Amino acid sequence: MLEIGFCTLEDQCPYLKDKRSRIEYKYIENCPKEINNELIKRGWRRFGRYFSRPICKDCDECLSLRILVNEYNFSRSERRVVNKNINTKVILRTPNLSNEHLFLYDKYHRFMEEKKNWKRYDLSFKQYYNLYVDGFMNFGYELAFYIEDKLVCVDLIDILEDGISSIYCFYDPDFSYFSLGKFSLLNEIQIAKKMNLDYIYLGYFVKKCQSLSYKADYTPNEILKGTKELFENEVLWEK
C-alpha cells in the first residue's frame, strides 16, 4: 500500500472568512476498506485517492459529526420528503462519469454561487474523475436519483465496516419541490439500517458556516473529540 503524506501552506479558510486554514493530506494508492474506515473515524475525508483533514493553527471549528443510525427516527417532515419522492428512481452503483454528471454538477454549483455566494470552479472530466470516481475500490458508490428518466441528484458515499461516509451530494435546483438533498441523506440512513451499520459520517460540522451548520439538525449525533493518529487505540466520540 503506497502512502504519501503532505500538507498545504496556510490559506484563506473556505468556510469562515476571518480564519486561515491548513490541510494535511494522505495519498493512498490502493486503500483497503478497513484503513479507510479507521481514517474516517479519526476525522479524515476521502476524495479520490486522497484523504484530508484540517490542521489549522488556533482554530478547531471543523468538527467531525456522525449520525447514530440505530437511534434515528424519521420526523413527520422527513416522512413527507420520502412520500414526495415515491416515484423517484434510486440506483445504488459504483461511481460513474458522464456528460449528465458534469452538467448536473455545474448547474448545482452555478445555483449555489448565486444563492450562497459559493466560489465556483469549472470542473473537467479528468478533475471530476480524480475527485469522485478514482479510488472507489470495494467501498465507493453513488446513489443516482432519476425523475422521469432525468438524472436529478448524485450522492457519493463510501460503505464502510461500521457506517456510511457521506462524501458529496449535488442535485438539480429546478426540482427543489422534492428536497433532493434531504432525500439523499434519508436514503443513506435507510441503507445503513438495512445493512446493520451504526453510523452516517457526515464530515465537518461548522457552526458559523451556513452550508455546514445544518448537519447538527440530524439527531441523535456524535462529535469527534480531539484527533488521533491511525491505529492509536482510543477514539472518543461524544453526543
From Swiss-Prot:
Keywords: Acyltransferase, Cytoplasm, Transferase. Its EC number is 2.3.2.29. Coiled coil: none annotated. GO terms for biological process: ubiquitin-dependent protein catabolic process via the N-end rule pathway. Pfam families: ATE_C, ATE_N. It is found in: Cytoplasm. It comes from the Bacteria. Transmembrane segments: none annotated. The keyword Cytoplasm applies. It is an enzyme of class 2 (transferase). PANTHER family: ARGININE-TRNA-PROTEIN TRANSFERASE 1 (PTHR21367), ARGINYL-TRNA--PROTEIN TRANSFERASE 1 (PTHR21367:SF1). This is Aspartate/glutamate leucyltransferase. The gene is bpt.
